[in-house]
């Protein structure tokens, strides 16, 4: 008799994805982040569902309803802070997952990579709209500033912004629709993640060497299920520590002040995970130019397969490219720092230089370094 997991139509899908899946024997802990992201998404959907049971998307009561969740709902404070800090963990895993893809050349699986970039956009949109919901000062002004960027689009810009707002300013209509979108988008993300996995399983996983691993596969279970559980425990430990010891560490104190359209906060800034893109946006004096740079800073990831000039897939044996990769990481950390600073000297010029370096590294220096390494191979 054949095992039910190999014959049952539903169990067969699970079996081929998580149990009998042939996986390379040498993938490192950098390959843990896919499962961690899945875990983060499930956590966010569950905590979000329980928050939505108590939240009201009305400008008069939104702030009070969040306060009510934290004060009066059983373990409401825990659910709220797990959701808020869970988003931070989600983005940490996302950035590490993308970084892994860049380092080891995983972007050569083009369908998987491009759907991954779409996933990144979708998660960023979800996080932005979620940040608006508590209706604090930073929620309101963040929504105003970011949606206003669309007015830079020629001809239709102003109409588009007013259409998104549902009026002539960020108000009740905006909050209600943002809540609706914030609820539906995670399910779209989950569907996209399914397609992401579908395309990944067409080709099989990449591995640190960047070479074909067809001749040396091992079953996903038990080897990588155990390995993923270790990653999951570390993630849970980190999230629990953050939530229980310092839940407001990554938040903005201004968001504990109810939204007031008549009072602008001294420094409007998004959550930490958007600061690098915000710094790129601010470093260009022209509004439309800034918006284009902002979008292109993420969209440039889609060009990675076209910019790959090396004869080797992975950076494992390419020291010049490795140096440039870590320079890119340092540059992104610099941009993140600058995004949280006021618009004054010397931060403006540092931000502009870091933005130029970001695009120069990706579009010019890394492809040239790969060509140089190809040439060095001949010696």
From Swiss-Prot:
PROSITE patterns: CYTB_CTER, CYTB_NTER
Coiled-coil residue windows: none
Binding, heme b b566: 97, 196
Membrane topology (UniProt): Multi-pass membrane protein
Source taxon at top rank: Eukaryota
Entry keyword set: Electron transport, Heme, Iron, Membrane, Metal-binding, Mitochondrion, Mitochondrion inner membrane, Respiratory chain, Transmembrane, Transmembrane helix, Transport, Ubiquinone
Co-factor(s): heme b
Cofactor binding description: Binds 2 heme b groups non-covalently.
GO cellular component, one term: respiratory chain complex III
Main subcellular location: mitochondrion
Localization (cell): Mitochondrion inner membrane
Transmembrane segments: 33-53, 77-98, 113-133, 178-198, 226-246, 288-308, 320-340, 347-367
Statement: the UniProt record of this protein carries the keyword Mitochondrion: yes
An example molecular function term from Gene Ontology annotations: metal ion binding
Family recorded in the similarity comment: Belongs to the cytochrome b family.
Its job: Component of the ubiquinol-cytochrome c reductase complex (complex III or cytochrome b-c1 complex) that is part of the mitochondrial respiratory chain. The b-c1 complex mediates electron transfer from ubiquinol to cytochrome c. Contributes to the generation of a proton gradient across the mitochondrial membrane that is then used for ATP synthesis.
Note: Heme 1 (or BL or b562) is low-potential and absorbs at about 562 nm, and heme 2 (or BH or b566) is high-potential and absorbs at about 566 nm.
Name under which the protein is recorded: Cytochrome b
Originating organism: Scapanus orarius
